[in-house]
Design a protein with these regions (language model features):
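A short beta-sheet element
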Residues: 36-101, 106-109, 114-118
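Non-catalytic DNA-recognition/assembly elements of restriction-modification systems
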Residues: 1-36, 124-159
């Protein structure tokens, strides 16, 4: 590691796209997760996004960041980011989690994340190879945390 990190903005590095409405009454139980601003809210028979991606809370649970390893449907209370050749998606997920987007509430009645303000955030990003190495390390730690959670659930069920 040790390549030059570049200064850019969130909007240039990983532009947020708007999710698309999918009311509960129109959802058909299926294999693809449906995400809102607070995480997974159901499933559907077809995905809007045909790859893995990042989901960012736009309305309600402002700035929450979720990752889908499978194709998914982000509803209109969320933004999403998909992979691109210049960035590692897992690195991007971890980077977005570290930005404090949940502190960027722009609306008073219903909490909301202003895309323009989020896009304007200055960030520094490493070369792709370093992004991949960082994501690998953090992903291993996430896997270990999940394994520990599963072990705790199993032990609690046995007690």
């Amino acid at each position: 590691m040790g390549g030059e990190w570049i200064e850019t903005t969130v909007g240039e590095f990983c532009p947020f796209e708007y999710g698309k409405g999918l009311p509960e009454r129109k959802r058909k139980l299926g294999p693809y997760p449906v995400f809102g601003s607070n995480g997974r809210v159901g499933s559907h028979v077809e995905p809007l996004i045909k790859s893995s991606g990042i989901i960012i809370g736009r309305k309600g649970t402002v700035g929450s960041v979720h990752f889908s390893k499978v194709p998914f449907w982000p509803i209109d209370t969320a933004f999403y980011v998909v992979d691109a050749s210049h960035r590692d998606l897992r690195f991007t997920y971890y980077m977005l989690q570290s930005l404090g987007l949940d502190q960027m509430n722009a609306d008073s009645a219903v909490p909301g994340l202003n895309r323009t303000a989020a896009h304007a955030r200055n960030i520094k990003v490493p070369p792709l190879s370093e992004q991949q190495a960082i994501a690998c390390i953090l992903g291993s730690l996430d896997d270990k945390i999940e394994l520990n959670r599963q072990m705790n659930r199993t032990l609690e069920e046995m007690a």
